[in-house]
């Protein structure tokens, strides 16, 4: 430490006038001290006021510039020294040194700027103002194909500098993307795949940029998928594969890149990893199994990539995924069910899968998770069943297979995601299936649970689906028994509330169901309709200019129907319905205008 003090004193006394040899000796002493104890030595250097002298030496383009840059790089490893480096105006001369032709000067300058920028807003801002990032990007572009060790080392440092400069800063990352850094990084990865340090630095830089939506198009315009999959296939260590996974996940959110990754053979790699890790209990293997199967499911979210892997239901990938359903591994069961749900995004696939008896595999899986089951697996399997039930031709087949009976086993579930999918599955199954709708609609336990969930204000999705299923049971069954069960369970008020929904489709479903109630069982429901203020709601819907034509039409049909009830008729007479309906006779929609004329006639006859 005495040597350090002596060197600092000499530098202070002689400054830039010191001979080159003496200056070199003092700087060597500083480097030695920093290597021995960075924290203490860097603080002593700052306290001595020498940092300002460094700015002068760097500005003078002295032959000692690379050594000074090296010292700054070492000092800036210390978090507390980064702001002092900015305040000593070291960044402008360092950025100027980036124009040097000397490899060592560039290396130490890149290190110094990278370390100053690490988690340091002021440092980044100054480098940005001085145009440092553009110079570094240009260096990488011009040197990309050089494979000598010193060039690769320099490019590794420059990639690290850009990473520290832009990390967790969207505007600086966007700036780098606009400078064209993405194709450069992809080329670096392709050319230097044998260089571990440079490869890892490129991947970390990818990871930073891939999160940005604006980066996805640029990545898609390169051969990034081919390059990364090629690199991925070479990796045998967990840690290195994990770094690549961290890049793949955000990239695979883009549909074009999904397809590129599938074509580059990523799925086969993922399936191999699943096979290697499925029976292992090691933490690393368990984590890698999850990451691989999750990524596999993500690739299936793209329509094009999903169809390519489905291959008309004959694809080897599709068959492998099916084999995950009966597995004893919860993660594979989950991924298998989610994959089926993704394959079931078009009618053709759904029809093929139902004909291939996949429904039974899903029912068997659900049956294993009824008692204290895995909620995520329940949710995924129900999602798959819901999607499979969408095509009309599948509904009867799925009902015959016992899907409703299995789904109803989850009625006691207190988990909103499971409740939501359960409701959606039942609603899809009974669409235009009168017998099934009647059977379910007479199930008091189900209807009571629906009424309970119609009040689940903390879970809008569950509340909305409950209302829709309640309405669907009536609309598709057209059954007096179903209506009576709904009345007894207290469901009428929820259908009236549903008629005021912000979603036109829900409003309409409610009005049609209420119309059937009024036509088939008005007497049984009139008290509930009155206390739910149905007539006021209908008056509001007809008066509101924003109401859709079908809402106005069905509201008028319903008004005509409820006039058969004395108390409801009185409610109608209290409100100025005739004025509202008369105005609708000139409505631009002919069906609405015709119904307005009919309704007006009914009012005239019955008033």
From Swiss-Prot:
Cysteine disulfide links: none
Cellular localisation: Cytoplasm, Cytosol; Endoplasmic reticulum; Mitochondrion
Domain of life: Eukaryota
GO molecular function, one term: small GTPase binding
Coiled coil ranges: none
Function of the protein: Stimulates GDP/GTP exchange reaction of a group of small GTP-binding proteins (G proteins) including Rap1a/Rap1b, RhoA, RhoB and KRas, by stimulating the dissociation of GDP from and the subsequent binding of GTP to each small G protein.
Protein's recorded name: Rap1 GTPase-GDP dissociation stimulator 1-B
Source species: Xenopus laevis (African clawed frog)
């Amino acid at each position: 430490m005495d040597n350090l003090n002596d060197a600092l004193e000499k530098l202070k006394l002689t400054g830039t006038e010191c001979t080159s040899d003496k200056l070199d000796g003092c700087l060597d002493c500083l480097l030695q001290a920093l290597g021995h104890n960075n924290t203490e030595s860097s603080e002593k250097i700052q306290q001595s006021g020498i940092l300002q002298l460094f700015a002068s030496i760097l500005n003078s383009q002295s032959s000692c510039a690379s050594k000074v840059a090296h010292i700054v790089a070492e000092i800036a490893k210390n978090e507390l020294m980064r702001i002092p480096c900015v305040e000593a105006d070291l960044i402008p001369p360092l950025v100027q040194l980036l124009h040097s032709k000397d490899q060592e000067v560039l290396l130490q300058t890149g290190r110094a700027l990278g370390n100053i920028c690490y988690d340091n807003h002021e440092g980044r801002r100054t480098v940005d103002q001085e145009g440092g990032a553009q110079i570094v990007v240009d260096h990488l572009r011009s040197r990309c194909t050089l494979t000598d060790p010193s060039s690769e080392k320099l490019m590794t440092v420059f990639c690290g500098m850009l990473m520290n400069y832009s990390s967790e800063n969207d505007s600086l990352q966007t700036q780098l993307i606009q400078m064209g850094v993405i194709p450069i990084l992809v080329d670096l990865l392709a050319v230097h795949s044998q260089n571990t340090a440079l490869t890892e630095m490129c991947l970390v830089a990818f990871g930073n940029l891939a999160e940005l939506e604006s980066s996805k198009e640029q990545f898609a315009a390169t051969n990034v998928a081919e390059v990364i999959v090629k690199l991925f296939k070479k990796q045998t260590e967990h840690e290195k594969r994990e770094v690549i996974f961290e890049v793949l996940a955000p990239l695979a959110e883009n549909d074009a890149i999904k397809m590129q990754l599938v074509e580059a053979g990523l799925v086969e790699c993922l399936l191999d990893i699943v096979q290697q890790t499925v029976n292992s209990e090691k933490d690393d293997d368990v984590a890698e199994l999850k990451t691989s199967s999750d990524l596999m499911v993500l690739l299936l979210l793209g329509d094009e990539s999903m169809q390519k892997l489905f291959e008309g239901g004959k694809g080897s990938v599709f068959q492998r995924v099916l084999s995950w359903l009966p597995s004893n591994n919860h993660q594979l069961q989950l991924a298998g069910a989610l994959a089926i749900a993704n394959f079931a995004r078009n009618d053709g696939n759904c029809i093929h899968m139902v004909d291939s008896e996949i429904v039974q595999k899903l029912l068997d899986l659900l049956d294993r998770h009824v008692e204290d089951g895995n909620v995520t697996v329940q949710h995924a399997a129900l999602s798959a069943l819901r999607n499979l039930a969408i095509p009309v031709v599948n509904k009867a087949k799925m009902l015959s297979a016992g899907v409703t009976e299995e789904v109803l086993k989850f009625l006691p579930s207190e988990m909103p995601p499971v409740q939501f999918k359960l409701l959606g599955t039942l609603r899809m199954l009974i669409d235009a299936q009168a017998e099934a709708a009647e059977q379910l609609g007479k199930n008091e336990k189900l209807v009571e649970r629906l009424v309970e969930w119609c009040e689940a204000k903390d879970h809008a999705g569950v509340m909305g689906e409950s209302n829709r299923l309640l309405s669907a049971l009536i609309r598709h069954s057209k059954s007096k028994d179903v209506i009576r069960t709904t009345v007894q369970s207290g469901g009428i008020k929820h259908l009236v509330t549903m008629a005021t929904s912000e979603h036109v489709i829900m409003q309409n479903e409610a009005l049609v169901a209420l119309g059937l109630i009024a036509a088939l069982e008005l007497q049984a429901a009139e008290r509930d309709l009155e206390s739910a203020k149905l007539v006021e709601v209908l008056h509001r819907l007809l008066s509101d200019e924003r109401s859709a034509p079908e809402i106005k039409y069905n509201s008028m049909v319903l008004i005509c129907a409820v006039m058969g009830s004395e108390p409801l008729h009185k409610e109608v007479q209290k409100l100025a319905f005739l004025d509202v309906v008369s105005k609708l006779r000139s409505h631009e929609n002919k069906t609405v205008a015709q119904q307005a004329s009919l309704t007006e006639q009914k009012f005239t006859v019955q008033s």
